Each structure stands twice: as structure tokens, then as C-alpha cells.
């Protein structure tokens, strides 16, 4: 990588963020496409968010990615939002375009692109069961409605039902996609919906510890159900292991990370990220079987 006076900057902004895989992905993309850019990780306190956004314009940056806790906090500092960001109510990508800062959300786009590219799954006219109603789930649900999902059922903890209904009801109303929000502790109802689904998604952090299970181990998966987990460390979560033991196809969150990055990269540079090459590098780097 040759850095000179014309090199433009992009960054991921969060707290914490030093563990991020994003610099590896984007800097490899800059190298392979020949775009004169460099991508870094900025761990900043919340009081520095406003000046960080000002610096995107000041230093003519491509833009930034955002992770927690700044996906909602950034919105007041932006000039406009894309349809997906407005529907989700959160931003993970800021695009610097013609002196304006545009908030975009590529999480849901990246998730379904990973399912399409890596597992041949198309969400149109499919029934989905989603575990959790937090940020990752909301992005996936919103994108599923935009992409033509037939029906979506969300299971969340009893104490989160009211908050989840408040955040997801506007999405259901705006898109007209049938949506139910139910308590996760009703295992019989959970089994019924999983049995009638084409896709099951764990949008929670349950399983990140390597042993916690977001569904009862007695759950039976229908033969052709695709089971997805937004977690990518560990690469095989307890949910994915349970699905594999029943012969179901599975996918973790690493593909989502790659393809949401690809959407951001194209928004900034106008160039397609070489995702096949970068996926091969990720497989090698993290010894993915």
C-alpha cells in the first residue's frame, strides 16, 4: 500500500473497536482495486462524535463505518438518510458525497447478500423466524421486508416485548409485511413457527460464549430450514452445531460482515469489492473449515 498526498481515509468508529476485522477487509479491498485509500479503526468517547463527523468533511474522507454505541447517536449530525437507514432507525455507514454526509445502513443488505452468495438463499416469498429484537435483528427484519419476505415472526425475551413492538411496528406498517412479536419462553409456539419457516436467524449475542443456546436443545428443525447466526466468533455457535447435528444448512455472521463492508465500499468508491478473494483470505486467516 502506497500512501501519498492523494490518499483518502475511511474509518470504523466505535467503542471498543480495536478488535475489528474491518480494517483487514477494507485495506485488502483498496489494495486489490487500486483505489488510493486507507482504512483505520478509531476508538472515541461519545463527546468526540460531533467533531469526528466534522472531520469527515474537513479531511475529505470517503466516510466512516459505525458500530455500537454510535449507530443512533450519529443521526442528528447527518444531512440525510437512505431508505434503509430511516426504516431501521440506525446508521452503520456514513457516505461523504458532494459535501454532504449521508447515513446508510448496510447490515441487512450484507446479511441477505451473504445468504444469497454463500448459500443460494433468496428471501423473497420466504417465511422467517428471528430470535431477538435488538439492532442486528431490526436491520435484518427491515431489509427482509424491503426484499419481499412473505412473513416474519420475532421471538424475544418477555421483558423486551414492549420495546421490540415499539421499534418494529412502524416497519410492519410501512411495508405491509405480516409480522408477529412473541415471547421466547413459549417453546411450543417457537417450535410451531420454526417448523413452518424457511429461515431461522439468531440476532442475539447468545452463543458468543461458546456454550449458551438461544433455543431449547429439544427443538427440531424442518429438513430444508437454513439456520443463520449473526455471531462469527466463535464460528460455530451452539445453535449452528445443533442445526448441523440435524443435517440442516447453516451460516455464521462472517459473511454478513464481509458483504455489509462491500456495500459500504461501493458506496464510497464506486468500485465493487473483490469479495471472493477477500473471503478466501478470511477463510485462511481465521482457519474456517
Swiss-Prot record:
Shikimate binds at residues 20-22, 67, 92, 107, 232. GO terms for biological process: amino acid biosynthetic process; aromatic amino acid family biosynthetic process; chorismate biosynthetic process; shikimate metabolic process. This is Shikimate dehydrogenase (NADP(+)). It comes from Streptococcus suis (strain 05ZYH33). Homodimer. NADP(+) binds at residues 83, 132-136, 230, 253. HAMAP family: Shikimate_DH_AroE (MF_00222). Belongs to the shikimate dehydrogenase family.
Amino acid at each position: 500500500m502506497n500512501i501519498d498526498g492523494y490518499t483518502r481515509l475511511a474509518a470504523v468508529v466505535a467503542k471498543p473497536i480495536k478488535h475489528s476485522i474491518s480494517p483487514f477487509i477494507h485495506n485488502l479491498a483498496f489494495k486489490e482495486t487500486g483505489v488510493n485509500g486507507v482504512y483505520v479503526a478509531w476508538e472515541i468517547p461519545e463527546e468526540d462524535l460531533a467533531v469526528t463527523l466534522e472531520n469527515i468533511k474537513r479531511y475529505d474522507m470517503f466516510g466512516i463505518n459505525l458500530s455500537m454505541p454510535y449507530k443512533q447517536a450519529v443521526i442528528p449530525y447527518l444531512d440525510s438518510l437512505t431508505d434503509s437507514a430511516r426504516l431501521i432507525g440506525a446508521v452503520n455507514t456514513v457516505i461523504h458525497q458532494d459535501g454532504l454526509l449521508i447515513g446508510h445502513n448496510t447490515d441487512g443488505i450484507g446479511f441477505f447478500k451473504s445468504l444469497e452468495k454463500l448459500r443460494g438463499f433468496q428471501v423473497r416469498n420466504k417465511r422467517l423466524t428471528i430470535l431477538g429484537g435488538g439492532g442486528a435483528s431490526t436491520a435484518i427484519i427491515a431489509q427482509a421486508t424491503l426484499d419481499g419476505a412473505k412473513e416474519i415472526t420475532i421471538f424475544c425475551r418477555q421483558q423486551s416485548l414492549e420495546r421490540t413492538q415499539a421499534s418494529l411496528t412502524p416497519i410492519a406498517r410501512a411495508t405491509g409485511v405480516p409480522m408477529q412479536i412473541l415471547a421466547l419462553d413459549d417453546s411450543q409456539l417457537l417450535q410451531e413457527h420454526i417448523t413452518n419457516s424457511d429461515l431461522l436467524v439468531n440476532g442475539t449475542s447468545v452463543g458468543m460464549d461458546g456454550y449458551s443456546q438461544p433455543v431449547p436443545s429439544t427443538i427440531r428443525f424442518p429438513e430444508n430450514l437454513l439456520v443463520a447466526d449473526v455471531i462469527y466468533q466463535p464460528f460455530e455457535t451452539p445453535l449452528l452445531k445443533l442445526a448441523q447435528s440435524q443435517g440442516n444448512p447453516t451460516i455464521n455472521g462472517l459473511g454478513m460482515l464481509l458483504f455489509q463492508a462491500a456495500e459500504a465500499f461501493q458506496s464510497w468508491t464506486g468500485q465493487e469489492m473483490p469479495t471472493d478473494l477477500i473471503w478466501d483470505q478470511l477463510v485462511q486467516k481465521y482457519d474456517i473449515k
